[in-house]
């Protein structure tokens, strides 16, 4: 195996190294009135969410997997005072601060934090207005007066524990994504600094998508089925135009993939990413949410004569997957066993969002009892974790993890 720092040529190869983000104070800055703005449906209890996340990380370590943390990698990337200052300025520029006085006060607050990881975690948590010096009434501008009841000078980033989405590892390359919502697009700044300045990863990884692009793509829609085949979702969060840009870059940079299967499915929050309805769990097995099957369209995309060739596939999905993966037969394991009530409940609680850590070995939430029983009946080994608080953000084990290294299969 090569010594390249990023090696992800499948969804199922034995996981060697993975990046997580331990939920932090950003969750304590979630408020009922602003949940929709911050892409949440409920407010997790931070203390229990951290316990659940720590248990998730330990379960991975118990399987011999090295666990990295986003906040540590980002802090390690601030390798000089100049890079640190640049990071603060980019963070401020992207924070949608409308008045100069507030920006000056926040800059002073951030420069006053000397520890790099503490600085990174503060940028993640957001900044309440009460943390800043009060602006005298006579010095307030119209923005201050109109937005006087809004509590934040800079919004928190509560979705950060879903490390799958801001960037995606593809082969030896990275797709540094432009995300669906402004509140999440700021998250990609940490990936930018990791892959530009980190002592291990900085300058050593090709980017096949860039956060400065103007069309949207998220890592939950990017699946590496094999060393030859990718699957990409056209979803609520990922535009078809982004997929075309990504694929041209992948093919031109010779990242190693020969074909992409583009999955077009229902555009709604329930099915926000492909990996919320479809994941690979073994050489010949996938979980799937039955509700997407009727309206699913799959397109095969290749690169010939310096242009994309796109063909809509009309056949059976299992047969299409078997053909592209070189296996005799593919089994589609339906979330909830196909029962309409169990399927809807367990998909909402991420029953289809499995993290495969080796062929036939998957991490799942323990709460999805119907789907878990079926997976075990298919011969899979399940590592069950609690997620009563983590699931409130609408993401499962795959959403909460970004593989950096897998063994070849």
Curated annotation (Swiss-Prot):
EC number per UniProt: 3.5.3.6
Location of the active site: 399 (amidino-cysteine intermediate)
Broad EC category: hydrolase
Protein name: Arginine deiminase
Catalytic activity: L-arginine + H2O = L-citrulline + NH4(+)
GO biological process terms on file: arginine catabolic process to ornithine; arginine deiminase pathway
NCBIfam families in UniProt: arcA (TIGR01078), PRK01388.1 (NF002381)
Name of one Pfam family that matches: ADI
Source taxonomy: Bacteria, Bacillati, Bacillota, Bacilli, Lactobacillales
InterPro entries: Arg_deiminase
Entry's Gene Ontology molecular function annotations: arginine deiminase activity
Family: Belongs to the arginine deiminase family.
Natural source organism: Streptococcus pneumoniae serotype 19F (strain G54)
Keyword terms: Arginine metabolism, Cytoplasm, Hydrolase
């Amino acid at each position: 195996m090569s010594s390249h720092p990023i090696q992800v040529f499948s969804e199922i190869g034995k996981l060697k190294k993975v990046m997580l983000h331990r939920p932090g104070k950003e969750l304590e800055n979630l408020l009922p009135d602003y949940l929709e703005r911050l892409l949440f449906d409920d407010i997790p209890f931070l203390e229990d969410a951290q316990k659940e996340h720590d248990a998730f990380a330990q379960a991975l370590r118990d399987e011999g997997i090295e666990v990295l943390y986003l906040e540590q990698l980002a802090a390690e990337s601030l390798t000089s005072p100049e890079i640190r200052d640049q990071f603060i300025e980019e963070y401020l520029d992207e924070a949608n601060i409308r008045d100069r006085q507030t920006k000056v006060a926040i800059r002073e607050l951030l420069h006053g934090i000397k520890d790099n990881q503490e600085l990174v975690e503060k940028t993640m948590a957001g900044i309440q207005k009460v943390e800043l010096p009060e602006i005298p009434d006579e010095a307030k501008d119209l923005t201050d007066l109109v937005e006087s009841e809004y509590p934040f000078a800079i919004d928190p980033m509560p979705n950060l524990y879903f490390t799958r989405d801001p960037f995606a590892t593809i082969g030896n390359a990275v797709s540094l994504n432009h995300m669906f919502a402004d509140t999440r697009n700021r998250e990609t700044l940490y990936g930018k600094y990791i892959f530009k300045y980190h002592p291990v990863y900085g300058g050593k990884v090709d980017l096949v998508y860039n956060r400065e692009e103007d069309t949207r793509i998220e890592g939950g829609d990017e699946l590496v089925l094999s060393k030859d085949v990718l699957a990409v979702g056209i979803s609520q969060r990922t535009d078809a135009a982004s997929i075309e840009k990504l694929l041209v870059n992948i093919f031109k940079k010779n990242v190693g993939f020969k074909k992409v299967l583009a999955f077009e499915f229902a555009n709604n929050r329930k099915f926000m990413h492909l990996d919320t309805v479809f994941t690979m769990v073994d050489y010949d097995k996938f979980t799937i949410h039955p509700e997407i099957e009727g309206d699913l369209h799959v397109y095969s995309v290749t690169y010939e004569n310096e242009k994309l060739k796109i063909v809509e596939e009309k056949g059976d999905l299992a047969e299409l997957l078997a053909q592209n993966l070189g296996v005799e037969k593919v089994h589609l394991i339906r979330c909830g066993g196909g029962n309409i009530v169990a399927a809807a409940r367990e998909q909402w609680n991420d029953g289809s969002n499995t993290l495969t850590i080796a062929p036939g070995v998957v991490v799942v939430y323990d709460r999805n009892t119907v789907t878990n029983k079926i997976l075990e009946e298919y011969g899979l080994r399940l590592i069950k974790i609690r997620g009563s608080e983590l699931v409130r953000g609408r993401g499962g084990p795959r959403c909460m993890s970004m593989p950096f290294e897998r063994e070849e299969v």
